A protein has these predicted regions:
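Structural signal for membrane-spanning alpha-helices in multi-pass inner-membrane proteins
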Residues: 116, 159, 185, 189, ...
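Helix-terminus/linker motif at the lipid-water interface of multi-pass membrane proteins
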Residues: 36-55, 124-131, 187-194, 257-284, ...
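Small-residue-rich hydrophobic transmembrane alpha-helices
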Residues: 54-114, 151-170, 278-336, 340-342, ...
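N-terminal transmembrane alpha-helices
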Residues: 11-48, 62-77, 81, 106-113, ...
Length: 457
């Protein structure tokens, strides 16, 4: 446990650039791996099952988003709390948070599965399924939902591994899952001819294997955080605080879920089932870059949180700047790929000409303001890591509800399906402006605080 304490102190003393690399690189590798994981499923399904199966898979995105929303409600909230508690040297509470995460994920994971499985067909039709695509969507989702409690537990424990100073172990768990999934996918789809169900079975099996390994890590008595009797009973304050902090990513995912439903329904209306598949492909490509930025954000979180708690505002300032530079480099790369070679990127997923055309056109539009979106994502995450959940929620919801939703509804009235594609970059632009204003105001506050502290010390 002593080495863990020392590990936490390095967050307040070591050079920021070195720390950010040390914390962000494992998270970036893990996030890239998990978005590749989604891509691999799409690629094998696209080539091994067919273009309509890609549309069927894309229809399940909102439901997967919804499941992820409940996962992040617990995972993000608890890991932020653990970071703060370890910073305050309150190890007993940190232990209890770990136990409560296991209990909460169990309850939410099973509850979610039961409710969604009972009404699966109506949900999928509401999400934009058609008689041609429903069977693909249903086959995939039934298996994913049966394994939902495993997914929740796996994501929740991974967030805690990172927060308790083991970013490498969290990365290992994610990469293991991806590798196993990538090996099992072609075996189940091509060899056993299980179709889209094979992809779902591969996903859940891979998570089970990683989960077993995570439990092994957390049962080690020498760990600062370890599973033991008496920590599983839900405690009001822990549950309340976890949910309060996790509310921001939860609402973000919830909003994203509804956005995707509107996009899918709109595209289907103008361009038919294939257009939903096109959005699915564009989503996967864009997601790769977004996930890398999220990895950077995860690396920033413990550093910003700890130094904010220790009132070292100059270090908070430094880590934020570095993270924004990194994020902008990543999203600019995404912009170049989408503008210069969209057909190439898209053809990884399908050989179907019509689907390639629809997807490439969409990709070109979606990444047009991509260079500035990194800044907006970092800012929203920054407010979350220093415990200003309200501001983080406001930022993420302005993009989704204030800008994106109205655009998706109004723009197609003039421009048809192009309006739906254009609504995405337009709302990115607007949200970045809002983020810039909020960040500027926050730093004015830090400056006055920082000067006050210098005088006092």
């Amino acid at each position: 446990a002593a080495s863990d304490v020392y590990k936490r102190q390095e967050l307040g003393t070591q050079p920021i650039g070195k720390l950010l690399l040390q914390y962000a690189i494992p998270a970036i590798i893990a996030m890239t791996a998990s978005s590749l994981y989604n891509m691999v499923d799409s690629i094998f399904i696209g080539h091994g099952v067919g273009p309509l199966a890609i549309s069927g898979l894309a229809i399940t995105f909102p439901l997967m988003n919804l499941a992820a929303a409940f996962g992040s409600l617990v995972g993000v909230g608890a890991s932020t709390l653990v970071s703060v508690k370890l910073g305050q040297k309150d190890y007993a509470t940190a232990q209890n948070i770990l136990g409560n995460v296991v209990t909460l994920n169990f309850i939410i994971g099973i509850g979610f599965s039961i409710l969604t499985l009972l009404f699966l067909d109506p949900i999928l039709y509401f999400f934009g399924a058609s008689p041609d695509t429903i069977s693909y969507a249903r086959d995939y989702m039934v298996i994913i939902l049966l394994g939902n409690v495993i997914t929740h537990m796996y994501l929740g424990l991974n967030a805690l591994l990172r927060a308790s100073g083991h970013p490498q172990k969290a990365m290992t768990a994610t990469i293991t899952t991806v590798i196993i999934n990538t090996i099992l996918d072609p075996i189940f789809i091509y060899l056993f001819h299980w179709g889209i169900q094979g992809a779902a079975i591969a996903t859940i099996l891979a998570q089970i294997i990683s989960l077993v390994w995570q439990f092994k890590t957390f049962t080690n008595k020498n760990e600062l955080l370890h599973l033991r009797r008496g920590i599983y009973k839900l405690r009001g304050t822990i549950v309340k605080n976890t949910i309060a902090i996790g509310m921001s990513p939860f609402l973000m995912n919830l909003a994203a879920c509804f956005i995707v439903i509107f996009i899918n329904k709109g595209l289907k209306e103008y361009d038919g089932d294939l257009a939903i598949g096109a959005f699915g492909i564009v989503n996967r490509i864009v997601f790769l870059f977004v996930m890398i930025v999220m990895g950077l954000n995860q690396g920033m979180q413990p550093i910003a949180g700890y130094n904010f708690g220790a009132q070292q505002y100059h270090r908070v300032n430094q880590v934020l700047k570095l993270t924004i530079y990194g994020a902008t480099a990543v999203t600019t790369t995404g912009f170049l790929v989408g503008e210069l070679m969209p057909e190439l990127a898209v053809s990884a997923f399908t050989t179907h000409e019509g689907l390639i055309q629809l997807s490439a056109t969409g990709l070109r539009i979606v990444v047009i303001f991509f260079p500035i979106i990194g800044f907006q994502m970092v800012t929203s995450n920054f407010f979350q890591s220093i415990g200003m959940a309200g501001k983080a929620i406001f930022l993420s919801l302005t993009r989704q509800l204030l800008f994106l939703l109205p655009s998706i509804i109004l723009l197609p009235l003039c421009w048809g399906s192009a309006g739906i594609w254009w609504s995405m970059p337009i709302s990115d632009l607007a949200a970045s402006v809002v983020a810039g204003i909020m960040l500027y105001r926050q730093f004015k506050i830090f400056k006055t605080h920082g000067n006050k502290l210098k005088v006092e010390n």
